[in-house]
Amino acid sequence: MQIKSPYYRVSVKAKINFNGKILLVKEDGKKWDLPGGGIEHYETIDEALKRELTEEIGVSDFILTSGPKNFKMIDAAANRPLIFIAYELELDSATEFHPSGNVEIGLFDPGKIQDTVSYSPEYSDYIRE
């Protein structure tokens, strides 16, 4: 496969275990994934994580429980290399989600999401852990 660009798009992701389920999002009908997105040039990683979670699921108050864990892979659809920086988060059990209009939220049993996330095996395994 010929890569279009040697530059990596760096994204920050949040693995959220909410009441024993893993929270995944689906944007614009695409595939299920951890919430998060690209880090803007002017942002710190923490700022980007807070912005992305506010934009996607309407949550800005959280506690980091572990991280970061890094993943490097190829986005086959866009034919570009990606780097994800993933953090595990904890939310209050009474948290209410307010997703943006193009985002669907799903809560999945960790043992049953193996066919839901279609990135690299290492990344998929991390989500299921």
Which positions does each model-derived feature cover?
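Acidic, metal-coordinating catalytic segment for phosphate/diphosphate chemistry
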Residues: 1-13, 19
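Active-site beta-strand termini and strand-to-loop segments that position acidic
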Residues: 16-19, 89-91
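C-terminal lobe/hinge of AMP-binding adenylation domains
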Residues: 26-29
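Unchanged
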Residues: 39-63, 71-122
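Short loop/edge segments at beta-strand edges and connector loops
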Residues: 66
